[in-house]
Amino acid sequence: MCERCDMREASTIEKRRRFLTASAAMAAMTFGGAGAFSGVAYADAVTKAKRDKLTPDDVLSLMKKGNTRFKNGRRADHNYLAQQRATASGQYPLAVLLSCIDSRAPAETIMDLRIGDIFNCRVAGNVENPDILGSMEFACKLAGAKVVLVMGHTACGAIKGAIDNAELGNLTGLLAKIKPAVAGTTHTGDRTSNNYSFVDAVARKNVDMTITSIRKASPVLAGMESSGAIKIAGAMYGLQTGVVDFFDV
């Protein structure tokens, strides 16, 4: 082989080596923290062993990091078919979320989560009821979830409806559960749904009151929280910003 050919081959090998090194570094940047542990290679599903080693604070940290990836446009390259196959024989979710039905606030997407990472309870205004409490108890006591997260969002239609005393079939009773948050919100200025800062203040108050209701209505969850097995936390999602604001976490 000629000397020039040898040089070309060596150059090609070196370029390929640099490309593979750079690709590995980018993968580490993209997937670091995306799996069950920060710094561990991305996996298609969380395992029981990895989930059980996490603390509630670890789980909340993973959610916060996932939202940071989402809002920065650096979401993990999810292979949903692989995730579906990996979770088909069992599930080991990290958390159970209670969030609003708003189509713009899908928890798995805005926190860059995988199939099988969370249980997701959704109802207008993210209010609890006996069925949801039972679902949360199943998620934590029987399935091993480490966090109960109640997540409201800005510009919430259910909150506006409660403020405006809207009435419509079964929705009337649901909105009645939000009205204590309306009454309990201290806010100067216009206390109508036209005032978005008031709407968002009520939404935040509603999250706080829902957390209090969960602790009072579920001795199972309250006991698990007292023992440190789980954490019950709140958050607000900003529709305009893409940021999930975790309360005191």
Where are each of the predicted segments found?
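GST superfamily/GST-like fold recognition
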Residues: 226-246
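Divalent metal-coordination and catalytic microenvironments
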Residues: 63, 97, 150, 234, ...
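Polyanion-binding loop/helix "lid" in catalytic or ligand-binding cores
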Residues: 179, 183-232
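Short HxH-centered metal-ligating active-site micro-motif
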Residues: 109-199, 246-249
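N-terminal secretory signal peptides
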Residues: 1-14, 25-28
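C-terminal segment of N-terminal export signals and the immediately downstream linker at the start
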Residues: 34-72, 76
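Twin-arginine (Tat) signal peptide motif
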Residues: 10-20, 34
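Conserved beta-strand-loop surface patch within small alpha/beta domains used
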Residues: 75-133
